[in-house]
Each structure stands twice: as C-alpha cells, then as structure tokens.
Amino acid sequence: MPLLLSGQKFRTDLESFGCLAILSPLEGGAETRLLRRLRASGYQTQITSARGLGDPVVFLTQLHGIRPPHLGHQNVGRNGALGEVQQVIPQLNELLVEDKPLVLWLLEGQVLSKSELLAISNLCQKEPRIKIVIEMGGARSIKWQPLNEFINKD
C-alpha cells in the first residue's frame, strides 16, 4: 500500500490551525514521512510521549520542580518525607531560541484529558511559533483534524 503523501496539505493545515489531532496507521511510517517533510520545509521537530507530562503547559514552557525516584533508604531529616525537589528546565525553551518554527509531536495523546488538550490548544494560540501534533489513536489511513474540532466532537 503506497502512501503518496506530499505533506503540503498537512503543513498548510498545521500552519493555519496550529494544533492538530492525528489518527495514523498502527504499523507506523506515515508520521515519520510527515516529520521528514516538515523538517525539509524549515521546521524544528521534537517527538515526545504524552504519558507522564503532568500539566503539559507547565512541563513544556515553565521552570518546574520534580521529585527524583526513591532509591531506597535516604536521610529523612535532610529533605523531609517527600524528598528533595529538583528544578527542571522547560523542554521547549532551548528550541525556541532560534527563529525556526517548532513542531512538537506528542505520541499516545489518547491518555490526555479534555482539559489538558484544551490547555495545549491554548498554548498553540498564545505562542504562534509552536505547532503541536497529537496522535490520538490509530486508523487504517492517516487522518487529521484541528484539535478543537476533535475535542468538541467527543
């Protein structure tokens, strides 16, 4: 089954809507073709999983604290019962330094709640250099629609 996809319609939809929900074949391959075509047209791309994001907007754009995994017996008196908090640099800060637009491709987007999807959609509207593609499941052929339409459909 050849996939004759130039990526032009996908790119224009991504530029006009900013945030897309995509259904791609489970065997893979279609999304990497689209990513390659986006890179060729001047976009930076980053792929990450939606699992474990927590608050996606804070995780992607703001300085935030995390607690490292518990590795056995540790001194409770030093850091309290919860452990120390480490500050983590936002994922998108370093990538937004350049003038090139950025496409963030989120895998396993079906685990995100409706409010998290709305927050991601609002992030695309606030920061026009960020374009986000969220994989929302599988389909026999690759399909996409604006994230707002996908959210309101449910």
Curated annotation (Swiss-Prot):
A GO CC annotation given for this chain: plasma membrane-derived thylakoid membrane
The EC class name is translocase
Primary location group: membrane
Which EC numbers characterise this protein's activity in its record? 7.1.1.-
Q: Which domain of life is it from?
A: Bacteria
Localization terms from the record: Cellular thylakoid membrane
Q: How is the protein disposed in the membrane?
A: Peripheral membrane protein
What's the protein here called? NAD(P)H-quinone oxidoreductase subunit N
